[in-house]
């Protein structure tokens, strides 16, 4: 980025922070948190959204965000190169989440959130940290709202990333194992003592 584009991006990020902080809709607050967590580190590509998905999400959740800010933020999104294994995991988890999407939620919003969650499972930390949320309870509330049937299946109260990896394994008909990002987590040995 040049100094000019850095400044434009920083202004756009400030506008997004303001829009998220002043959102009167819980979903806008959630998406504001998810997006600003990555935008603040210039990691919007890690959300796993295409530029069109990202632009649509901003338009739906933050309709008062200036178009110049949307363009500045969207211009930093590049396709994520994923290995075949990671790509298959993301696609399977995304489909599994969408199978359980709350019909009362806008389908495009559920689709964006499913992509964000699936891509967060590739990173090496607890899911709540990878999403930029403030704890497991925030992940539980998000999943209960957007994917209630899936959330209800976690009767053993597994850590969410581990549970989602098990959902992928069930979909693929393979033995359960860790999500791609799990081996880098500080608690990997706790979640997978035999791995």
Regions found by a protein language model. Give the residues of each.
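Cys/His-clustered metal-coordination modules, chiefly Zn-binding fingers
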Residues: 142-195
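Hydrophobic, aromatic-lined core segments that form the binding pocket/scaffold
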Residues: 2-164
């Amino acid at each position: 980025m040049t100094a000019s584009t850095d400044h434009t991006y920083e202004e756009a990020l400030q506008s997004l922070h303001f829009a998220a902080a002043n959102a009167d809709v819980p979903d806008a607050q959630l998406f504001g948190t998810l997006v600003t967590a990555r935008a603040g580190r210039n990691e919007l590509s890690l959300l796993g959204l295409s530029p069109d998905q990202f632009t649509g999400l901003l338009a739906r959740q933050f309709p008062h965000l200036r178009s110049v800010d949307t363009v500045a933020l969207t211009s930093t999104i590049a396709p994520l190169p994923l290995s075949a294994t990671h790509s298959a995991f993301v696609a399977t988890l995304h489909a599994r989440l969408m199978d359980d999407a709350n019909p009362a939620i806008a389908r495009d919003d559920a689709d964006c959130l499913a992509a964000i969650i699936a891509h967060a499972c590739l990173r090496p930390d607890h899911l709540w940290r990878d999403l930029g949320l403030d704890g497991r309870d925030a992940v539980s509330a998000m999943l209960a709202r957007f994917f209630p049937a899936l959330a209800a299946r976690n009767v053993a109260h597994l850590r969410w990333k581990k549970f989602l990896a098990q959902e992928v394994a069930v979909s693929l008909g393979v033995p359960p194992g860790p999500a791609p990002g799990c081996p880098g987590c500080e608690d990997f040995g706790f979640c997978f003592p035999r791995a």
